[in-house]
Amino acid sequence: GTEPYIVGGHTASGYWVDTKRATTVNGLFAGGDVAGGAPQKYVTGALAEGEIAALSAVEYVSENGISPIESSNIDSHISEVESFLTKKDSRFTTEQLEEAMQSVMDSYAGGIKTNYRFNEKQLDIADYKIKQLTELSDSLYAEDFQELMYIYELRERLTVCRSVIAHLKARKETRWHSFAENLDYPNKDDKNFNKYVNSRLENGEIKIILRDLVPGGKSYEHSN
């Protein structure tokens, strides 16, 4: 399986970007599959967005410079990296946790194993299991920097898992049949959920924000 993923190039999902492809994180730009708001753009769209994002990033740096990183943040990351490279008592490998992650999403979070169908009880189970895997990932061991990269890739994907689960749970309807079938809410609910479902990761918790749709022709820009 390949779940989880947030693919802005195929669906209406993706990270919130403005017209310059800036995300809500200052200095971070996105294009292609991770950039939301334009489904079915595929490779040509990714190439165009990549150029827009690159030019915007250059403009951002020229106007704002590169902010220095606080030494405390550097020390914290060095300590984390060293812990992955030195402790050898991990009960699981990165590959085992990745397979477990994919199994959880496939089975409980609307994955291919259930033909993209799910209910709230399954989502609760998925959320619980993904949090368990996230805790287990703290104790992983990397023999070299290549394996270290795999650990961080897994941890990022586990965060994406939590986001996918939170968004599926927040939209109490079925809007795109065959892509995601909410068995508890099998019908479309324009009255309550003809909206954007946004989220923010704040202090380790995902906060869901429902926003009204913007009519065609008008921009939907964020402000940091």
Tell where the protein language model's regions lie, with residue ranges:
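Flavin-binding catalytic cores
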Residues: 1-3
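Short loop/turn motifs at secondary-structure junctions and domain boundaries
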Residues: 5-9
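Glycine- and aromatic-enriched mobile tails/lids
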Residues: 10, 16-30, 34-224
